[in-house]
Curated annotation (Swiss-Prot):
Keywords: DNA damage, DNA repair
GO cellular component, one term: mismatch repair complex
This protein's record includes keyword DNA damage: yes
Entries under SUPFAM superfamilies matching the protein: ATPase domain of HSP90 chaperone/DNA topoisomerase II/histidine kinase, DNA mismatch repair protein MutL, Ribosomal protein S5 domain 2-like
Name of the protein this chain belongs to: DNA mismatch repair protein MutL
Similarity comment: family membership: Belongs to the DNA mismatch repair MutL/HexB family.
Gene Ontology MF terms in the entry: ATP binding; ATP hydrolysis activity; ATP-dependent DNA damage sensor activity; mismatched DNA binding
PANTHER family xref list: DNA MISMATCH REPAIR PROTEIN MLH, PMS, MUTL, DNA MISMATCH REPAIR PROTEIN MLH1
Keyword DNA repair: yes
Length: 674
């Protein structure tokens, strides 16, 4: 039977450190929060090797009393609270008294501090929780703490650290968030002696946002605020141009504490999606100020999660604030003056009348274009006394030649048999019988469709001629066709290609099919180092947020081998000179940003091949889109290319590209068989 042991101080501190100090960014968080609690207005953070070698914090706060310097490193020693009652009304960021002893137990610490009332400060040096010296020192008011060799005595913890670039990015992201919460404090961040961040501390939140995220972000923000008796909500939300595929650019602060709360994040996103259907996540910086008694921050070791006394109420306040601001923003964009609304109504009536006149004119032309035979003069007389309005009332269907089909009616089928029976027509020339079959009418539609097709294909870069691809499609893993050669019937809703083979109907999603073709070709080109590149006419300079730049810098070789020629341009800026050939018509800035976001979500443990595949998946942006009109030849070539790729049945995102219905299945749906 194991007996109960009392752990020694060193072991207990290391256990506590495991909860409080997960990685270098945890150290930065605890120390910067101490500086803010001390009333500092200027805080400098220096790190080396992702914070593993050195973390140095300098502030101009109130400092620590000389007699309290050594006491501050004792477990549960704090100046923030005195008894249990204070726990339920916390006004400071820190309060447990765990940070300093936890950090000192797993690192080498040099702590200096001086208050306004003393001429000299105190310097305390601790290594692995053991005091080495306590001496007087000369310094200005404030505190300076150096943390070196983090986890030097807990080597097992080092295995869980990510790369230096990743740890640096986490620290940068943390300091960015803290800067947003404290616009009246000037923050400086140095990484390996290079200045990464410098905020002005002028109290203007928009200036901090501009410094961190750039000018374009600051210019596309919508301010919101809502005030209730027990809570105030305010902040900025980005318009749809700032929406991204991840939540990386979302910041939530409660009483200036950066926290994560799924419910409140959903409140903002729901309000945003009421006016935008982008399917992406909005940019926002949200502040909630409430009474300390109404929240509990003592539910998580890192205080990154909090509990509200009435979370439903806070949810509603947040939703209403954002929803109201978005509604006004959209309203300002689309509202018409009263005079213009009246003009619009008048114009609408005019268009309706004009449309009716055209329909009547079309019916008149119908009599001249349909070849028919009549055996009795009486029937001929009935035809020439034809009353269009009467037939409208009778809802008689009339077969109209393609030449006279209006754009609105091109998707309808016109059958003349039943309609002409009602008018007692005896014969109709088979040559003039009309059915809306794209194969039969493609020559008539050719001129009308070609202009729209050319425009859409120029945008998508899809080539009709297979030779434009060279032999690349044939080189992708297998030449064996994966499904039979199909006969194209037409295009439905400008999105789906209809084709048939052996009494089976095939529906192909043109966008999903084309993006999979591009994906496999691009992946193959990357693997063979044969990516065709397209120089930009004018090289584009892009300034990235610091975190994004660090990810780019870590994956430079990946971008280069993927067909991008990018050079550094100073101060987190890059110069895009060349891109893969089929991406040259896309926005390079959005493309690079999306690729970096994809790499962010992957982490650093993925292989180079996985990263290449993630970048290759961006080829979908160059694929033909829904609502792109394709000619029969273009659809045939698209399907033919799809037949010979490795996996033609799913797009890079896992959605199906092609589905089929047998004649038997269709007969069952129409109850022709049981």
């Amino acid at each position: 039977m194991n007996r109960i042991n009392i752990l020694n101080a060193d072991t207990a501190n290391k256990i506590a450190a495991g909860e409080v100090v997960e990685r270098p960014s945890s150290v930065v968080k605890e120390l910067v929060e101490n500086s803010l609690d001390a009333g500092a207005k200027n805080i400098t953070i220096e790190i080396q090797n992702g914070g593993e070698s050195l973390i140095k914090i300098i502030d101009d706060g109130s400092g620590v009393h000389p007699e309290d310097v050594e006491k501050a490193f004792n477990p549960h020693a704090t100046s923030k609270i005195k008894d249990t009652y204070d726990i339920f009304s916390i006004n400071t960021l820190g309060f447990r008294g765990e940070a300093l002893p936890s950090i000192a137990s797993i690192a080498r610490v040099d702590f200096k501090s001086k208050t306004e009332d003393f001429d000299m400060g105190k310097e305390l040096i601790i290594s692995g929780g053991e005091k080495e010296s306590l001496t007087d020192c000369s310094m200005n008011r404030g505190t300076q703490i150096e943390v070196r060799d983090l986890f030097f005595n807990v080597p097992a913890r080092k295995k869980f650290l990510k790369t230096t670039a990743r740890e640096s990015a986490l620290i940068n992201d943390l300091v960015n968030r803290i800067s947003l919460a404290n616009p009246d404090v000037s923050f400086k961040l140095f990484n390996n002696n290079k200045k990464i961040l410098n905020t002005y501390g002028n109290g203007k939140l928009i200036d901090v946002i501009r410094t961190i995220y750039g000018k374009s972000t600051a210019e596309n923000l919508i301010y919101f605020e809502e005030h209730k008796d027990t809570a105030s909500v305010y902040g900025f939300i980005g318009n749809d141009t700032l929406a991204r595929a991840s939540r990386n650019n979302q910041s939530l602060f409660v009483n200036k504490r950066y926290v994560k709360n799924r419910s409140l994040t959903v409140a903002v996103e729901n309000a945003f999606r009421s006016f935008n259907v982008t399917g992406k996540f909005p940019f926002f910086v949200l502040f909630i100020d409430t009474y300390p008694e109404l929240i509990d921050v003592n539910i998580h070791p890192t205080k990154s999660e909090i509990k509200f006394k009435d979370e439903r109420f806070i949810f509603k306040v947040v939703f209403d604030a954002v929803h109201s601001a978005m509604r006004e923003y959209v309203k300002d964009t689309f509202t018409l003056p009263e005079e213009e609304e009246k003009k619009f109504e008048a114009l609408k009536e005019e268009v309706i009348q004009e449309s009716l006149d055209k329909e009547i004119s079309t019916l008149e032309k119908l009599k001249e274009n349909i070849n028919y035979k009549v055996s009795e003069d009486k029937k001929k007389e009935e035809i020439y006394s034809y009353n269009p309005s009467k037939d409208y009332e009778a809802k008689t269907e009339v077969n109209i030649p393609v030449d006279f089909l209006s754009k609105e009616n091109q998707d309808e089928s016109f059958s003349i048999n039943n309609s002409l029976e009602n008018n007692e027509f005896k014969e109709v020339s088979a040559k003039r019988e009309i059915s809306y079959d794209p194969i039969l009418i493609k020559n008539e539609l050719k001129d009308k469709v070609s202009e729209s097709t050319s425009e859409s294909l120029e945008r998508s870069d899809y080539k009709c001629n297979k030779n434009e691809y060279g032999n690349s499609i044939e080189e992708i893993i297998y030449r064996e066709a994966k499904f039979p050669k199909l006969r194209v019937i037409g295009q439905f809703n400008k999105t789906y290609i209809l084709a048939e083979y052996d009494s089976t109907l095939y529906l192909i999603d043109q966008h999903a099919a084309h993006e999979k073709i591009l994906f496999e070709k691009y992946s193959s080109d990357i693997a063979k180092k044969k990516v065709e590149i397209q120089p930009l006419m004018i090289p584009l300079v892009v300034t990235l947020p610091t975190e994004d730049y660090l990810y780019y810098d870590e994956n430079k070789e990946i971008f280069e081998k993927a067909g991008f020629k990018i050079s550094d341009f100073g101060d987190n800026s890059i110069r895009i000179e060349e891109v893969p050939y089929f991406l040259d018509k896309l926005n390079p800035t959005e493309l690079i940003t999306s690729m970096i976001n994809n790499l962010k979500k992957m982490g650093t443990g993925e292989t180079v091949e996985v990263k290449y595949n993630k970048i290759a998946s961006m080829s979908c942006r160059a694929a033909v889109k829904a609502n792109d009109v394709l000619s029969i030849l273009e659809m045939e070539n698209l399907i033919e290319d799809l037949r010979y790729i490795n996996d033609p049945f799913h797009c890079p995102h896992g959605r199906p590209t092609i589905i089929k219905f047998t004649s038997y299945e269709l007969d069952k749906k129409f109850k022709r068989i049981t």
